[in-house]
Every structure is written in structure tokens, then in C-alpha cells.
Amino acid sequence: IFLVYGNKNFTRAKHAHKKCSQFIMPIHGKIELYCENKSLKFQKKLDYKKKEAYLIKPLTWCKIKFLTDYSILMVFCDQEYDFKDYIVKYKHFLKIIKKK
């Protein structure tokens, strides 16, 4: 479990995981989530007042934009931190999902 803090228009993530799933939920403020995997692309707004959350599965490219100042995002992971699990280059991510 970890927390991510951000102010309005601040962007985080911009990566995917090979094996790790992440359950994310704002505990203060609002975020906009941009996700892409082999089968779909979408964006979704999450608001802590509405108790909204989302499960990001492995091999899903994700970008998070904070929509309000003082936003806090709580992230639950099913794996311990391992930098080798990260896919940080979008072109590399596209090659990987094309093979699957």
C-alpha cells in the first residue's frame, strides 16, 4: 500500500506493470485515469466523495492526472515493489501487448 499526492493538473504513472495489479482509490480529491491494454483504451474520473475506485490489471498502460489540489490517491498492490516489473517506455509496452 502506498499514497500518491498531487495538485491540479499534475500527472503521474505513465507506465504499465508486467505482473502487478493495482487497486486505486482517491482518498481526497479527484483524479482522471487514462488506461490502455490490448483490448481497449478509456479514461475514467474517480472522486473520493463518490467512493470510486478502479482495478488496474497487469499489462495496462496507465496515466493519472490530478483534477483538484491536495489530491491523495491510495494504491493497493498484489506484488511487492520490483522495478523489473515496470514497463516505462510506451513503444515497448505496445510491442509487448501486440505479442500477447
What are the residue ranges of the model-derived segments?
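Non-catalytic, conserved peripheral segments adjacent to functional cores
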Residues: I1-Y54, D69-Y70, F76, D82-K100
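Glycine-centered loop/turn positions within well-structured domains
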Residues: C62, S71
